[in-house]
């Protein structure tokens, strides 16, 4: 719960908690989750290094959102980081911790819907 703004599970209803628990209840789920993080630190990182060296950027419009009570807000600036990787990026912090959808769905939708409306083709 330390990843939530309130440092507890109050943002999660019981159905959501049950869903999370179900997905972390078996060795296979835990293994898959660990492999996802492992790939991010190895294969994905290696591909990112090559792309960055070749000055390749994400070409589609990109929306970057982060919780203002989370680690990204403690860095130099999440949006500035994404500008290095994207041709067109916009975004801002949302009053939440790591779990934006659960902690502040109203502000998440207020950011997502206009972005998607502007870029729907």
Predicted regions span which residues?
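Non-transmembrane alpha-helical segments in soluble domains
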Residues: 1-3, 21, 34, 38, ...
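Short secondary-structure boundary segments
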Residues: 3-12, 119
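Conserved serine/cysteine hydrolase catalytic core
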Residues: 8-85, 90-93
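Catalytic active-site module of serine/aspartate enzymes centered on a nucleophile-bearing elbow/loop
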Residues: 88-121
């Amino acid at each position: 719960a330390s990843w939530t703004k309130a440092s507890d599970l109050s943002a999660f209803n019981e159905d959501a908690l049950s869903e999370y628990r179900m997905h972390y209840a078996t060795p296979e789920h835990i293994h898959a989750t660990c492999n996802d993080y492992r790939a991010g630190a190895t294969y994905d990182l290696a591909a990112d290094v090559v792309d960055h060296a070749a000055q390749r950027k994400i070409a589609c419009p990109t929306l970057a959102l982060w919780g203002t009570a989370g680690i990204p807000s403690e860095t130099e600036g999440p949006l500035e980081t994404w500008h290095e990787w994207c041709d067109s990026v916009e975004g801002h912090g949302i009053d939440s911790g790591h779990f934006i959808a659960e902690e502040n769905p109203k502000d998440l939708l207020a950011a997502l819907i206009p972005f998607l409306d502007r870029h729907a083709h």
